[in-house]
UniProtKB/Swiss-Prot annotation:
Main function: RNA chaperone that binds small regulatory RNA (sRNAs) and mRNAs to facilitate mRNA translational regulation in response to envelope stress, environmental stress and changes in metabolite concentrations. Also binds with high specificity to tRNAs.
Superkingdom of origin organism: Bacteria
Subunit structure: Homohexamer.
GO molecular function per UniProt: RNA binding
GO cellular component terms, A-Z: cytosol
Swiss-Prot/TrEMBL keywords: RNA-binding, Stress response
Protein name in the entry: RNA-binding protein Hfq
Sequence similarity: Belongs to the Hfq family.
Gene field: hfq
Organism name: Teredinibacter turnerae (strain ATCC 39867 / T7901)
Length: 87
């Protein structure tokens, strides 16, 4: 399951750490706006005037208000997410 999170988690973490305002579009077309307060494997906590727990399976698109640079964890690794595991 970690392969699906190799880009998602660092991207959401940058949005959270830098408090970048985002628009989150849900699969039903609803647009939510706020800042990523926290996230885990299944949900994103979005904060505006209130905090909303948004299930990731309901999210279609995350649009930041400004460009986001996601640090590359291991640019040489093209298909192996088991970094330094020796496996």
């Amino acid at each position: 399951m970690s392969k699906g999170h190799s880009l998602q988690d660092p991207y959401l973490n940058v949005l959270r750490k830098e408090r970048i305002p985002v628009s989150i579009y849900l699969v039903n077309g609803i647009k939510l706006q706020g800042q990523v307060e926290s996230f885990d494997q299944f949900v994103v906590l979005l904060k505006n005037t209130v905090s909303q727990m948004v299930y990731k399976h309901a999210i279609s698109t995350v649009v930041p208000s400004r460009p986001v640079r996601v640090p590359m964890l291991n640019p040489e690794s093209t298909g192996n997410d088991d970094m330094e595991s020796g496996a």
